[in-house]
Structures are given as structure tokens and as C-alpha cells.
Regions:
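N-terminal catalytic cores of NTP/NDP-binding nucleotidyl/phosphoryl-transfer enzymes
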Residues: 2-52, 155-162, 168-169
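Residues marking the start of alpha-helices
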Residues: 13, 58, 92-95
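A glycine- and small-aliphatic-rich helix-loop capping segment at beta-alpha/alpha-beta transitions
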Residues: 24, 57-59, 107
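A general structural detector for well-ordered alpha-helical segments in enzyme core domains, enriched
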Residues: 24-27, 70, 74
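Alpha-helical recognition segments enriched in aromatics with Gly/Pro capping
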Residues: 39, 45-46, 71-86, 91-187
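A charged helix-plus-loop insertion that forms the helical arch/lid used to bind
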Residues: 52-68
Length: 187
């Protein structure tokens, strides 16, 4: 059959991957075994933004050195499940850092701030008068652009990433006229 473009993206915002990542990594390895084109994406640029999916507070800003050190730890841990000799490793700074302001605005036009603001943790932060940075609202669009840039057929991620992965589907459909799919693992 057709070889699919598949990816799993992880922002290196902590020193260790969590147990829930093992499920997604095992699924990725299964797809490697089936001969698909698999990318392990390191969200070094999106790690600078901070994902609101599971956070009540803004994430602390990491240095590029901290992000790189975390990536090394992630790869070492993930290699116990994923055969990296058959996987492409990419860093999303390769394309996100090249987007112009105009490019970013055009991407943002595909999304509604209302959809972002309706997410449970964002609603709670707003109700509690806690700061929600505008940069955080751009996070789903940037993760979605990862999917678009990699021309993915399937994106794998945890349940906490469903909203962000849907952004990739939106961009694939709106900008490429292509249906893409997500596999949601249960963490």
C-alpha cells in the first residue's frame, strides 16, 4: 500500500518524557515496522511558546541550551522503544523560524480565538483572572503548521493534544485540500 507520512511531535520542556509518551512511541514504532515514513519531531520552537493544553499557569521560558539538553534526554529515553535508525528527526525551528509576520497572520486567519478561549484550562485561567498570553493562543496554529509543513497523513499524540492536532488537519484541508488524520493515545 501507500507509504504514509506520520509524525509524533514532542516539545522538550522537561528533563524527561513521561510514561504516557510510551504509548505514542509504541504506535510510532508499529508504523515504522509497516514501512511508513515516520518523523520524530522536536518542538524546539514551540517549546519557547508553551502549550496551554495541560497547564493552569504559563510555562517558564526555557533557554535554547535547556531545550537541547532536554531533547538529548528525550531521544535517549525514547530509543528504548523507537528505532531511530528508521526514523527522521526534525526540529520545528527549521521552518517556524523562517515564517514572516505576514505568514504568521495568514496562518492565524485559519483559526478562531473563540475556539482557543473555549478550552477548559484557558476558560479557567480567564475566569480566575490569570494571565493567558497571546503567544499561547498562537501555539495550536504553530503546531498545526508542523503538520502542514511535513505534509503529514497521520499525526500521533496524547489526548491532551487533540485540539492542537486538529489545527494540523485544518491547515492541511484549507491550504492543501488534503484530508489528514490523527491517532489519539490515551494520556
Amino acid at each position: 500500500g501507500k507509504k504514509l507520512n506520520v509524525y509524533l511531535g514532542i516539545d522538550p520542556t522537561a528533563t524527561k518524557i513521561h510514561l504516557g509518551n510510551a504509548v505514542a512511541l509504541r504506535k510510532l514504532q508499529q508504523l515504522v515496522g509497516l514501512g511508513h515514513n515516520v518523523t520524530f519531531l522536536i518542538g524546539d520552537a514551540t517549546a519557547l511558546i508553551g502549550d496551554t493544553s495541560d497547564k493552569y499557569n504559563e510555562r517558564p521560558v526555557l533557554t535554547p541550551e535547556e531545550i537541547n539538553e532536554n531533547f538529548k534526554n528525550y531521544k535517549n529515553q525514547a530509543s528504548k522503544i523507537l528505532d531511530f535508525s528508521k526514523v527522521t528527526i526534525k526540529f520545528n525551528s527549521e521552518w517556524l523560524n523562517k515564517l514572516s509576520f505576514t505568514d504568521t497572520i495568514k496562518l492565524a486567519q485559519n483559526f478562531s480565538f473563540g475556539d482557543f478561549a473555549s478550552r477548559e484550562l484557558v476558560k479557567k485561567r480567564l475566569a480566575d483572572k490569570k494571565r493567558v498570553g497571546l503567544h499561547e493562543a498562537l501555539y495550536p496554529a504553530m503546531q498545526g503548521y508542523d503538520s502542514y509543513f511535513l505534509d503529514t497523513d497521520i499525526q500521533i499524540g496524547g489526548a491532551d493534544q487533540t485540539f492542537n492536532m486538529q489545527a494540523g488537519r485544518i491547515l492541511q484541508k484549507n491550504l492543501r485540500g488534503k484530508e489528514s488524520f490523527i491517532i489519539v493515545t490515551g494520556y
